[in-house]
Amino acid sequence: MEKPFGFVVIDKPSGLTSHDCVNRLRKVFGIKKIGHSGTLDPAVTGVLPIAIGDATRLISYLQGSKAYRGIIQLGATTNTDDMQGEIIESKAWPLITQNYINYLLENFRGEILQKPPIFSSVHIKGERAYKKARKGEKFDLIPKKVTINKLNLISWSQDKGELLVDVDCSTGTYIRSLARDIGDKIGCGGYLKSLRRTKAYNFIENHSVKLPEKSDFYPEGDKPKVLNPNIFFKHLSSFELISEEEIISWRSGRKISFQNNVKRLKVTKNNEVEDSFIHNNHILVLNKENKILGIACLDDSFAIKPKVVFNAIG
């Protein structure tokens, strides 16, 4: 039986860690080689891509932004910047209009400096920030650059003091920090009340399935569908190996001559061949059936050099 290879996109429920979801799928598929592409906080729901089998070796080559829909509660701040923490200050929110809020949100669009929450996985001298925070240690975190591609105000409830927002942002952005900083900008404090991830890299909600509830016995036909990884790597240029000799060389870890085979390269949209390689971009290596054989890059001798090889020989 062919081993499963690809991605399962889970619609993560609230209350479970990302690792809980991975463990559930390990039992469902009966294999250990399963991993997620990025942690979601337990309270957060939504798109959680999980690599199955050797596809775990592709995780580091995923690329793209992440998107969320969340509710920001004005009028209070918490020590975690979300509703899981303790309220440390309360202040009535002002009478404001949706137009005024949109005006203030302009400060958070584009490239900004953002300070992570103290309850976060950021390392401080070899220790996670949240561990220091739990021990009551005082420390400061250095702001880092993040990019907010889109920040749209969907609705504003003056009665509840709630902002409903859609955010598209770079990897590493903390929506909790965004909620905190927006509340500070309005002048009354704020925290993240709820959050759902709607996109991660090229994975969207339409790809997602419910997390299996029972993991001790799962009929073969009922397992979550493993999606072909090709559709999630359209940002990479690709090169096709057409002969059995080339495929054997590739599986043996040898370089493949590229110089006389430029026509077999499919360059990503709006990208020139020179740019694709001068900047050492990664290349998806495929066979004639469009199956992924691995990941390569172009070396100084203008040959395709293996970086990840599936079904390696020797």
Curated annotation (Swiss-Prot):
Its EC number is 5.4.99.25. InterPro entries: PsdUridine_synth_cat_dom_sf, PsdUridine_synth_N, tRNA_psdUridine_synth_TruB, TruB_C. Pfam families: TruB_C_2, TruB_N. GO terms for molecular function: RNA binding; tRNA pseudouridine(55) synthase activity. It comes from the Bacteria. GO terms for biological process: mRNA pseudouridine synthesis; tRNA pseudouridine synthesis. Gene3D superfamilies: Pseudouridine synthase. Keywords: Isomerase, tRNA processing. The active site is at D41. The keyword Iron does not apply. It is an enzyme of class 5 (isomerase). It catalyses: uridine(55) in tRNA = pseudouridine(55) in tRNA. Belongs to the pseudouridine synthase TruB family. Type 1 subfamily. Responsible for synthesis of pseudouridine from uracil-55 in the psi GC loop of transfer RNAs. HAMAP family: TruB_bact. This is tRNA pseudouridine synthase B. The gene is truB.
